Amino acid sequence: MNIVILAGGRSAERQVSLVTGKACKRALEDLGHRAKLIDPEEDLPLRLWQERQAGCDFVWIALHGPGGEDGVVQGMLEWLGLPYQGSGPLASALAMDKLVSKQIFRAEGIPTPEWLVWDEAQPLSWAECVARLGSPLVVKPSNSGSTVGISLARDEVSLAQGLALASSVSSRVFLERYIPGKEITLSILSGQVLPAIEIIPAQGDFYDYEAKYAPGGSRHLIPCSLSAAGLARCEAAGLRAYRVLGCEGLARVDLRVDADENPWVLEVNTLPGMTPTSLCPEAAAALGWTFTELVERMLQDALQRAALTRSAPSGSRPSPQPA
């Protein structure tokens, strides 16, 4: 097949996206496909139309962050009639907006940490924030990925610094209750839950951008240290979160697990990193899959769903389903 890979873009996750795109390009070429990498610019709609006219069969999205995994590119590809891997426009948009996804989780009875939206026009004092959510507090931008803009506030000074950081990458910021315990991530491929990974930061127990990307910033446990019952609860919560947002293909669910092994869903990433050292390929490797085999499974899954969509009377993707 002729495959166009979208990688790079303008988000804060540009460099990770480029590494993902190049790794996937090599894997797709190893599978016998012709792969072409495009770094999206303002003329992307025209460029994709031209690629379609030139015989493009499939688009592989390796973008991260706003403009890549928020449903914009997915909607564009739907309109052009070009198949692609991963979730559709609606699920992508819902998952990208952490505030909206948390509201859905709460409505569906999926445990997620308590939060409050920061209102710059009516700012709360540190004492008021702590009274509602406890201390420390997690400061988060509503729509960013790769832990960009996330920080842990332990006092009034670090709260102000965290708010400034989060506001630099998102117009909406919220504070979230910090759940002491374990950081667990679940990779899910079309309903199949891959082995859970426990993430242990080298410094403290908060998984931020530095812990994620700095050499030696964290270590991973596979299998994780949860009991069989705790792992089952974690997998059930992660799968429910995946389904209620209407995710398709590969997605990653990030959770905290407290001292009683109760899971708390933090967010869902519909276009997780796909570098050879990323979490999803690491989980797949625990099943004996190579990176190329994971890419092949993702591609075949997407092609099967595209065929079903074309044959459906409405020609549309499925909507999010109650868990």
From Swiss-Prot:
GO biological process: cell wall organization; peptidoglycan biosynthetic process; regulation of cell shape
Primary localisation category: cytoplasm
Cofactor(s) the protein requires to work: Mg(2+); Mn(2+)
Locations listed in the record: Cytoplasm
Enzyme class of the recorded protein, top EC level: ligase
Pathway: Cell wall biogenesis; peptidoglycan biosynthesis
Domain named ATP-grasp: residues: 102-300
Cofactor note: Binds 2 magnesium or manganese ions per subunit.
Annotated binding of Mg(2+) 2, by residue: 267, 269
Sites where the protein binds Mg(2+) 1: 254, 267
Listed InterPro entries: ATP-grasp (IPR011761), ATP_grasp_subdomain_1 (IPR013815), D-Ala_lig_Van_CS (IPR000291), D_ala_D_ala (IPR005905), Dala_Dala_lig_C (IPR011095), Dala_Dala_lig_N (IPR011127), PreATP-grasp_dom_sf (IPR016185)
GO cellular component: cytoplasm
Chain sites annotated for binding ATP: 130-185
Function: Cell wall formation.
GO MF term set: ATP binding; D-alanine-D-alanine ligase activity; metal ion binding
EC number(s) per entry: 6.3.2.4
Name this polypeptide is given: D-alanine--D-alanine ligase
Record keywords: ATP-binding, Cell shape, Cell wall biogenesis/degradation, Cytoplasm, Ligase, Magnesium, Manganese, Metal-binding, Nucleotide-binding, Peptidoglycan synthesis
Recorded catalytic activity of this chain's protein: 2 D-alanine + ATP = D-alanyl-D-alanine + ADP + phosphate + H(+)
Family, per entry: Belongs to the D-alanine--D-alanine ligase family.
